[in-house]
Every structure is written in structure tokens, then in C-alpha cells.
From Swiss-Prot:
Region (Domain I): 1-67
Organism taxonomic ancestry: Bacteria, Bacillati, Cyanobacteriota, Cyanophyceae, Synechococcales
Function as written in the Swiss-Prot or TrEMBL entry: The RuvA-RuvB-RuvC complex processes Holliday junction (HJ) DNA during genetic recombination and DNA repair, while the RuvA-RuvB complex plays an important role in the rescue of blocked DNA replication forks via replication fork reversal (RFR). RuvA specifically binds to HJ cruciform DNA, conferring on it an open structure. The RuvB hexamer acts as an ATP-dependent pump, pulling dsDNA into and through the RuvAB complex. HJ branch migration allows RuvC to scan DNA until it finds its consensus sequence, where it cleaves and resolves the cruciform DNA.
Keywords attached to this entry: Cytoplasm, DNA damage, DNA recombination, DNA repair, DNA-binding
Transmembrane regions: none
Protein name (record): Holliday junction branch migration complex subunit RuvA
One GO CC term on file: Holliday junction resolvase complex
Organism this protein belongs to: Synechococcus sp. (strain JA-3-3Ab)
GO BP: DNA recombination; DNA repair
Length: 204
């Protein structure tokens, strides 16, 4: 298994191909990767390290690359779930990013998971059912995640607030930051929503 590649960035491809090429000792490795990761890469020609997972198919070998071992390991768990192949695994990481994806699975937020292109309600349910316990154990130690998403409202209220804020045009990253910043005292859904909007309106 190829655990990671360290070399120089040669090329980046966007869109459906969504990949990067890394030159290691004169050999170029094409690695499929989430667009979120591609946006974080250094300029062409600069050194880069990519954490990889090799998928063996009947006619080809495909390397998938990520910015951290934790992101790679979550991808490996995602593609073990029935109905979730590498393409959907990348789509999930593109839609949410690592901390938000783990939070959505652990809190069984099926509606949020279903926002991923290609992920229907049943697939989202399977993700939550099969990965909830495993990812819950990882939340505190995920490498390169922002901060643990353990605060904020309880799961049932969080789902309602998140969906309402998404409908208002806020990003998942903005929403998670707002909910984490609010005091964790019990309050109705309407108050969580109001306080989150107030917090977000004050951000630059």
C-alpha cells in the first residue's frame, strides 16, 4: 500500500477529473482528490505531501489523495459502506469537509448528509448507522480538523437550525462556527436560530 507521496506538484486538474500530479524521483503519480484539497495545494513546482489510498479495479489502479491521514482514513471507512464508492466518498468530503462530515454522521443528521450530490436518503441513513460509533471515537483526535464539534445545541435542534441557516445562504463552515461559539445552555430552537443569525451578522 502507498501511504503517502512526497515530491513536487506538477499539475492540477479540476472538474470531473479532480486530480493532481506529483513527481517523485522522476515518476509522475496522478492522484484523484477532493476539490477542497486541491484548493489548498501550493503553487506548481513546490514540494507537496499527499496521503493516499490505492483502489484496485479490474482494469486499473487508482490513487486517491488527501491532505491528512485522518481525512484519508475517513474516506476508507466511507467507501466500505454499501452504496458508497470512491466517487461518493470524494463528494461527501467535498460537500462538508472533514469536521462537518464527522459531525453530521455522529449526530445522524440524514437530511444534511443528503445534501451531497448523489447521496439519497437511504444511503445517508446507512452512513449514519454504520459509521456513527466509529467516527464518534475519532472526533477528539482527528488530525488537522479544526476544533472538536462537541458543543452547540442537542442533535435534534442542531439539525433544524442547520437546515434553516443553510436555506438562508450560510455555508456549513459558518454555521458550525456560529453554533460552537454560542453558550450551551438549554433554549428553544427559535432562540438558537436567532442567536446564530445574530452571531453571523456580526462576523466580518
Amino acid at each position: 500500500m502507498i501511504a503517502f507521496l512526497s515530491g513536487h506538484l506538477v499539475a492540477i486538474e479540476w472538474g470531473e477529473r479532480s486530480s493532481l500530479t506529483v513527481e517523485v524521483q522522476g515518476i509522475g503519480y496522478r492522484v484523484k482528490a477532493p476539490a477542497r484539497f486541491l484548493k489548498q495545494l501550493p503553487p506548481i513546482g513546490e514540494p507537496v505531501r499527499v496521503f493516499t489510498h490505492l483502489v484496485v479495479r479490474e482494469t486499473e489502479l487508482v490513487l486517491y489523495g488527501f491532505g491528512s491521514p485522518a481525512e484519508r482514513d475517513v474516506f476508507v471507512e466511507l467507501i466500505k459502506v454499501s452504496g458508497v464508492g470512491p466517487a461518493l466518498g470524494l463528494a461527501l468530503l467535498n460537500t462538508f469537509g472533514l469536521p462537518e462530515l464527522v459531525q453530521a454522521v455522529v449526530t445522524e443528521n440524514v437530511r444534511l448528509l443528503s445534501l451531497t450530490p448523489g447521496v439519497g436518503h437511504k444511503t445517508a441513513q446507512r452512513l449514519a448507522l454504520e459509521l456513527k460509533t466509529k467516527l464518534a471515537h475519532w472526533r477528539q483526535g482527528l488530525e488537522n480538523a479544526d476544533r472538536p464539534l462537541a458543543g452547540g445545541p442537542p442533535p435534534a435542534i442542531r439539525e433544524e437550525v442547520e437546515m434553516a441557516l443553510l436555506a438562508l445562504g450560510y455555508s456549513l463552515q459558518e454555521i458550525q462556527a456560529a453554533l460552537q461559539a454560542l453558550p450551551s445552555q438549554p433554549r428553544p430552537t427559535e432562540e438558537w436560530l436567532r442567536d446564530a443569525i445574530t452571531y453571523l451578522s456580526r462576523q466580518p
